[in-house]
Amino acid sequence: RTAGAASRHIMGRVGDHGEVMAVIVTASGKLPLADLWVSEMRKLLPEVVSIYHNVQSHKGNAILGKEIHHLWGKKTLTSSLCGLAFEVSPFSFFQVHKPQAELLYEKALAYADLHGGETVIDAYCGTGTISLCLAQKAGRVIGIEIVKEAIEDAKKNAAFNHIENAEFYAADAGEFMPKLYQEGLRPDVIVMDPVRAACTCRSAGISQ
């Protein structure tokens, strides 16, 4: 990993049945010998079923940049969680340790104590994993996430699992939740994962 080199990182995502998505991250917009990258990875790593090239020109801790190119194979992986199937793309936020995530989600559902008619807000919902788990027991679930790509994945995941009582919005939850409150929405349950300090003050009106 060197900022001056063409390649900065190789990120791997693992789906069901051990399928792997590989994302080659470079500092510039070109991937030298792209065809060779693909052929060698396919030859040496048969579990790789999807290859992307991502461009991250900014220095810092963020691994992925906004520019992405699909080089070969599947565009998404399928990963199961809590009995639901989720499509995972390079930008998707998805729990790394699934067994532990399922235990946490079960605990969240227990605390929520849903009976079928509640309105639930899932703030910072990512790709909708918690939202869709909640939707199986709630009347209405509203997922809010600032990353547009994640919201697109969340909507696809809802359709993929035939869940119709979950809706998703690409917005800053700390700003969007007070707007919902002003419009008359009174949620029965608010879920935040992770808890955001910025949201504590901005959304005080709706969370109290």
What is each of the regions a protein language model found here?
Residues G12, G18-A27, A85-S89, V189:
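Short, aliphatic-rich beta-strand segments
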